[in-house]
């Protein structure tokens, strides 16, 4: 009997560690997806470096209580799967949201973003943001624009002076 309890304590500790380490966690209801669809979803998530696990709701609730995250108890009803991302905050929301568009059985229920509980609406809003790489390229474009414009202005002045001098 005590070995079963110890095993459950280890699982609760594992779940708590995953929630602590993850930058973004998305909870979904996967009821209605067949094996092929689940395999496809797991593959997409794995390629993005996201861990996708199914845990018992009671163990997940205990892990959340252990780390002090409140407000997710109502989410953990029925069959749930949890996507943990330790690197990219946007990736799990984006991948799961895109998958849910083509597979109506998948329902995003909520999540945790950088230690704060997030509603379904907040996860959907996060999914609409560009990826980290996209945001960095936008930032780089914004930073390069003044330099490029300055270089073009200097070139135009130089060309004009060259025309006047010739």
UniProtKB/Swiss-Prot annotation:
Record GO terms (molecular function): large ribosomal subunit rRNA binding; structural constituent of ribosome
InterPro entries: Ribosomal_uL10 (IPR001790), Ribosomal_uL10-like_sf (IPR043141), Ribosomal_uL10_bac (IPR022973), Ribosomal_uL10_bac_type (IPR047865), Ribosomal_uL10_CS_bac (IPR002363)
Record GO biological process: translation
Keyword Ribonucleoprotein part of the UniProt annotation: yes
UniProt subunit comment: Part of the ribosomal stalk of the 50S ribosomal subunit. The N-terminus interacts with L11 and the large rRNA to form the base of the stalk. The C-terminus forms an elongated spine to which L12 dimers bind in a sequential fashion forming a multimeric L10(L12)X complex.
HAMAP family: Ribosomal_uL10 (MF_00362)
Protein task: Forms part of the ribosomal stalk, playing a central role in the interaction of the ribosome with GTP-bound translation factors.
Listed name of the protein: Large ribosomal subunit protein uL10
